[in-house]
């Protein structure tokens, strides 16, 4: 109930000790940077692609991620933002597999992707692609109250007891029961009505795009915007 900021803090500090190294995308959320400062953890950055026409950050290149991993084999983990704040996704599965082959834990800030599992028309979720720890802002794209988020863990690489212990240290000892209840309600809506609601939303988005075509001064940026090499 301290937002995804709390989840990010717990995820990073559960796998990294002071002076350890972690690989992160440079366009990460401020909570990542703040956690590295608080935990005295060294970052190795992967810089994102930038669309030259819109200046929109378009996510990282797989080649850059692999190259950064190879140059920082002493890193304990890699943290990636997926999807980006602009909705851009990339081949996370390849990065997860490669990071795992080098003994690294994969943390994903999926703050804007809690809805991805609701339709086959949407990109694969971070968990489906092999991430070990995924932090989601349930309040952003699912119907829980603002500040309520979730941390998901899968596999045997993560020390769940350590993560839980750190959560207890940094999370409020007086959590709002309204926020916690809203998370339970969001899960119920997700499971019982989520797919139908998402289908309706995707149809409405298509209608909106078609309606915008008549406005010459408005351009809709597509997910596959071409990025010119400098």
Regions inferred by a protein language model and the residue ranges of each:
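Conserved PLP-enzyme active-site core in the AAT-like
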Residues: 2-222
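Feature for intrinsically disordered/low-complexity regulatory segments and propeptides
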Residues: 221-229
């Amino acid at each position: 109930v301290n937002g995804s900021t709390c989840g990010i803090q717990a995820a990073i500090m559960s796998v990294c000790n002071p002076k350890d190294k972690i690989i992160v995308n440079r366009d990460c959320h401020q909570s990542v940077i703040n956690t590295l400062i608080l935990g005295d953890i060294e970052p190795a950055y992967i810089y994102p692609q930038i669309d030259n026409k819109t200046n929109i950050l378009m996510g990282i290149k797989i080649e850059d991620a692999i190259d950064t991993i190879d140059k920082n084999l002493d890193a304990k983990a890699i943290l990636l933002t997926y999807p980006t704040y602009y909705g851009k996704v990339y081949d996370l599965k390849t990065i997860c597999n490669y990071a795992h082959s080098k003994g690294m834990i994969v943390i994903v800030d999926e703050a804007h992707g809690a809805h991805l599992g609701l339709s086959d028309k949407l990109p694969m979720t971070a968990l489906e692609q092999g991430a070990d720890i995924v932090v989601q802002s349930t309040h952003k794209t699912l119907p829980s109250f603002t500040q309520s988020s979730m941390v998901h863990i899968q596999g045997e690489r993560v020390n769940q007891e350590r993560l839980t212990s750190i959560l207890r240290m940094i999370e409020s000892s007086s959590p709002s029961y309204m926020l916690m209840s809203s998370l339970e309600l969001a899960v119920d809506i997700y499971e019982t009505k989520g797919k139908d609601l998402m289908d309706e939303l995707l149809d409405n988005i298509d209608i909106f795009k078609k309606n915008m075509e008549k406005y010459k001064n408005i351009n809709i940026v597509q997910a596959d915007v071409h990025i010119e090499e400098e």
